[in-house]
Structures are given as C-alpha cells and as structure tokens.
Amino acid sequence: MSQRRLFVTTALPYANGNFHIGHIMEYIQADIWVRYQRMQGHEVNFVGADDAHGAPIMIAAEKAGKTPQQFVADIAAGRKPYLDGFHISFDNWHSTDGPENHQLAQQIYLDLKKAGLIETKTVEQFFDPDKNMFLPDRFIKGQCPKCGAKDQYGDNCEVCGAVYAPTDLINPYSALSGATPVLKSSEHFFFRLSDPRCVAFLEQWTQDGMLQTEVANKVKEWFSPRQNVDGTTSEGLDDWDISRDAPYFGIEIPDAPGKYFYVWLDAPVGYLASLKNLLDKKGLDYDAYMADPGLEQYHFIGKDIITFHTLFWPAMLHFSGRKTPDNVFVHGFLTVNNGEKMSKSRGTGLDPLKYLNLGMNPEWLRYYLAAKLNARNEDIDFNPEDFMARVNADLVGKYINIASRAAGFISKRFDGRLGEPSADGDALLEVLRGASPAIQELYAEREYGKALREVMQLADRVNGYVDQNKPWELAKQPGMEARLLDVCTVCIEAFRLLTIYLKPVLPALGTQVEDFLKTGSLTFRDAGASLGSGHVIGEYKHLMQRVDVKQLDALFEPPAAAPEPAQLTPGGEALAAPITIDDFAKVDLRIAKIVNCEAVEGSTKLLRLTLDVGEGKMRNVFSGIASAYTPDQLIGKHTVVVANLAPRKMKFGVSEGMVLAASHADEKAQPGIYVLEPLPGASPGLRVR
C-alpha cells in the first residue's frame, strides 16, 4: 500500500468557554480515524484551533475587563487538560487570530474579488437603540424565516440549518437589551454564491457521491426554489454577506476601513492557518504542501454547520484557486437517556473535565462513544447504565480477561517465554487474522460501532477457546505442561491481535499492552504475523478497572442548589390568595384629578377629597391619609380611585369611592403612606387595566 498524505481537521470551537462533551465526542471520532490512518503507515497532519473572532467574544471580554486577545488566550490555556486527558492526538492547536489566518483570509478574499465574486450592497442592518451599536448576528434573535422556529439566531437556524440575513428574521429582538432593533443603512461586502459559476460548481461538488447521502440530500434542497414561512420564495443559493461593521473583533477587510470579515469567513480559513503554523514550525513549505496533487483534505463537523462547510467553504477555496476538501464527515448530536437533551441542572449533563477529575478512565468513554458511532449523522445516546455494562462486559470481561487468564501461567511456569500453538490454536488465530481486512475497512469508513462488534465477536471466540481448554485445570494436571503452554500462547497471540484492532480506540491501553508484550509499536501490518515461539513477554499487571457505579452517580450528580433565599414578606404581610382575571375585572380603577382637598373637622386621620373622575360631576371621597399629606400637597394631583365601590355613609358624610395608597403592615416599624400617582399624561376617567 502506497503512503497517503492526509490533512484532517475538526470544527473549531468558539473561544468563549470550555470544551463541552459534544466537542470531545467529535475529537474522539476524528482521533480514532486519524490513529487508524497512522497505523496504516500514512502521513497525517491533524490540526485544530480556537475560533477567536466575533462580537460575542468582544462583548464577553469587555464584561470580563480584558482585551479580546487576552480573553481568548485565557480560554486557550484551558484546552490542554481536555485534549491530553482524552488522548486526542492533534499535531497542532492554533488560533484564528494568529498572523497566518489574517494573511490567508485576506488573500483568499482578494482572490475571490479578482474572480469577480465580491460585490458591495447597501443593506439595512439592525441597530440596538438602547446599546447604541450595530447588533452582531448572534445578538439578534427571532423566528426563522424558512421553517418558522422561534428564538433562532440572526445568521442561521439551528432547527432547519437555513442561512439568512438578520433582517429576514420574523419578530426580531436584541439579545443584549431585549429592545426591538431599528434598521440603519450600511455598505456590506457579499460573496456572490448565486453566480452561475458557483451554482454549477457546487451542484457538481455536493452531488458527486462523496458526501453522506443524507447530507447531500439536505444540501440539494438549497439549490431549488422553495417557499419560506414568511411568504417569500427563495430561488436557490443566496449571496453571502461576509462583512461586519466596527466595532468588531476580527480581521479587517483590505482597503475597507471600519469593515471586518464576518467570523464564518475567516473561521474555516483557520484550518489552513493552523496547518501553515505547524508546517512553519517543522521548517516545511506550506504552498508546496498544499500543491501536492496527492494531498487529501478531510473535515469532521457536526450536522448544525453543514451549510458553511458544504457550500461557502468549498466555493471559497475553489474560486480562490485552492484545493477543495476531499470530504466533509458529518456527525449527529449526543443525547442522554434515550434522546433527552443534556442538562447539568437536571443531573443529565456530562462534563468532560469532571469525568477526568473523578478519575474515570478516558478510554471507557472513547470505547463507549466509538461503539455508538457510525458513518451517518444520526444522534447517539449516552445511557449511564449501558455505559457501565458495556465497558465492564466488553473491555474487562471479554478483552482484558483473555490476558489475565493466561499471562500468569506463562510468567510463572515458562519464564515468560511463549511456545508454539497447536493446530486448533492456529486455526483460531487464522480466524482472527482473517478478520483484519474487514475491521480495517470499517475503521476507514468510520463505522466504528460495527468494527467493535466484530472485535468483540472475536473476543467471544477466544474466551470460548479458553473455557473449553481450561488452563487453570491444565496447570493442576501432571504432564500437561506442553498443552498449558500451547493454550496460553494462543491466548497471548490472540490478545495481541485484538489489541491491534482496538488500538485506534484505546491508544493508551495499546501502549501498555505493547510494553507488556514487548512488541514495539503495533500497526495493522502486524496482524499478519505472530510473536513466535521463544518470544519473552513481560510480567502481567492489571490493565483496566471496572466502572464503579459510585463514579457514575458522582458524574451525573446535579450541582448543589443555591441556598434558598430568606422568605420575604412583602410590605410586612403575606400575599393574598390568588384571584382570577374575572375577579380583578370586577374592580373598576380610574384616574381621578384631586380638584380640592380639606381637613375633616373632628378627625385627625381623614382628608376630604373632591375628585374629577371624568363623569361630568365631582365625587366626594374620604381618605385616611392626613398623617402623610396636607391638603395643599394634593390639590391638582392625579391619583387612582376605585370608582365602582358602593357609596359608604360615614360620620362626616358619604364617601363615593376609595383612593389607592400604599403602606407597610406595621406602620410603627415602617411609618409612611404613599398615594398612587400616575405618570404625566394620564387624564381623569382613564381606566387602569
């Protein structure tokens, strides 16, 4: 097999927070494929980077009292424990704010401009009147114009995958202030994706059988006329707005002061920038590397960013004169407990760093996710009970068990030296060797679940051989040393083959086994050979613990609830029992003007108010507010009165309503009476609703 040269990436995480389990799942999926390719002897450059630009980072940095650069650097500093902890073998980790990305993004733009695919248009852009700034796409929310989903971002819909302009949103609002944004004009730069050249290229590129069927079918929808929920019709591919206005943390557009590239233009360029950064460190020429006709380029992404990677990205590369991806591998989302969305507060969130800090073996998770992953973009489900059962049964009960049942006899009885398998043992080993091509093909096609099922079926056959021959009984029988050596040798040879087949998924365990068996680094080529008679192995040491249910309980334990706030009694008394809206509607509250006010002779508490309630006649109302107000303080003011309260005959006259005022239940502890007064503009007779 000739050596291939591969350039592999994962989607760039946005640099505004720590990795979540979705990131780790994608990195594990890509890492398994990369390790398989390396075990085939191929040259792989596997790179990642932080997506470091955009208004959300700029705003978050400002809130944190940092520059955007320092904010991103602090996030990047926390990546290593995750990547090392889960054995992710990136060759390089970079940032889209690096000089390589600035240079490459600007050059790609200039090449697209030279190709006649950049144009400017005056657009109406949302502006937050409360924050006094143009709103980034991710700070505008509303209803998707394509499928009608609510609370979607201003640049793309997470439900249907549509990409649109923020102004296309239905019922938009500012995510920063909640205000309804206003439109202001601004000149923007567009990539002419609707150009017939782009359409023809993308129709061919996306439908040539390379992409997953479900992905190709989804992308195909965007080339056809379609009716949107807002009543408009999309005729096909739309031009792509690639600019944003200052203030913005990003890469400046050449010869366009105050204009920056939209983050989704420079983010995928970050793949190339990270590769260039790696090659520069190796002293290799980036341009020569990319010009190699044998170079293969692959991207692993989630299904929520298909449009960017299968339309914009290949078109940008092709029409700027660069290599296009050989494939884009799309995966689904990770759910928990039969499709439930993960939630830390409900105790169903899987925090990858917490997993590591609890001392849980990262290769348990690598194995479990691999056993669920396939070549389609289906969601996969994490079930804690299934996780424990599968890891304990497959890895410990089947795979590790083979070595633990044989290695001790080899070391104690035969000084660690292997023998020669007999005919029945050779037949079993040939079955294992014969499975190698199929297992390799499944890894190549990213059908990890099928590959691991094949491996575990082989492990079952080996364990059946062990159970049939019972080395622990052979060890007790005089004259059976040769058979004992034969059986145990077959077990060790089989264990080595199974280790080769599992090594892309379990790299750390693979290294332990290589040390134990004294084999050197194992590759798939080694599946056709054997350790051989006379080979000396090391002393067996326990290779893997079982999953403990206590660890799982701790992993999914919800965070401690915030202490309950002290129960407050508003105004010094408990709230009244709930009423219905119909109950409230019976009370007719009206705005009243206090035309006159006077003290009541014989009372220290009451004031007599003459009120205009808009009826064309005055009302007489007594109110117990004399301790707080003098008559001259109230005359000419407006207040709120209960207008339909039945007249009440009092010692000093008839009261024809009730003026609303507030006070504390304990007037001695908190003295004060406060008559309600509407804001300016209210007039007598208006109803309070």
Curated annotation (Swiss-Prot):
Alphabetized InterPro entries for the sequence: aa-tRNA-synth_I_CS, Anticodon_Met, Met-tRNA-synth_bsu_C, Met-tRNA_ligase_1, Met-tRNA_synth, Methionyl/Leucyl_tRNA_Synth, MetRS_core, MetRS_Zn
GO cellular component, one term: cytosol
Main location: cytoplasm
Cofactor note: Binds 1 zinc ion per subunit.
Motif ('HIGH' region): 13-23
Residues given in the record as Zn(2+) binding sites: 144, 147, 157, 160
Assembly with partners or alone: Homodimer.
Protein name: Methionine--tRNA ligase
Organism encoding this protein: Polaromonas sp. (strain JS666 / ATCC BAA-500)
